[in-house]
């Protein structure tokens, strides 16, 4: 069960519920391995060739056995919009803003 108050998003796909969360270590990995800088260039996470990597990073905390193939299967089954919606609580908690601010494209914390 997901808890948005703890920065968790939930997504139903592949016959189960997936919990998405973005620990700092995963954000560091995204920047070093994929060049996705969530603090200074959040739009970089939407690149099609990187989006599955962002999803995988958010899955790893609750689902350490998740693989790149699982991330792609989830995207194939539900599409990007439900995944983006599920990512929002995790991304907002990581950035230290509310989901509403994130949706409005609010200022990034300094």
Question: Which stretches of residues belong to each language-model region?
Answer:
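Short, isolated positions in well-ordered beta-strands
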Residues: 18-20
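Catalytic-loop motifs flanking and including active-site residues across diverse enzymes
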Residues: 50-54
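Charged interaction scaffolds used for protein-protein
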Residues: 1-13, 28-49, 63-110
């Amino acid at each position: 069960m997901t808890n948005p108050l703890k920065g968790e998003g939930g997504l139903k796909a592949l016959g189960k519920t997936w919990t998405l969360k973005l620990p700092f270590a995963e954000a560091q990995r995204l920047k070093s391995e994929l060049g996705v800088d969530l603090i200074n260039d959040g739009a970089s996470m939407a690149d099609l060739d990187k989006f599955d990597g962002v999803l995988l990073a958010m899955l790893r905390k609750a689902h350490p056995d998740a693989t790149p193939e699982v991330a792609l299967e989830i995207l194939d089954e539900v599409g990007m919009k439900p995944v983006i919606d599920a990512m929002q609580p995790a991304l907002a908690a990581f950035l230290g803003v509310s989901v509403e601010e994130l949706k409005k494209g609010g200022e990034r914390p300094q």
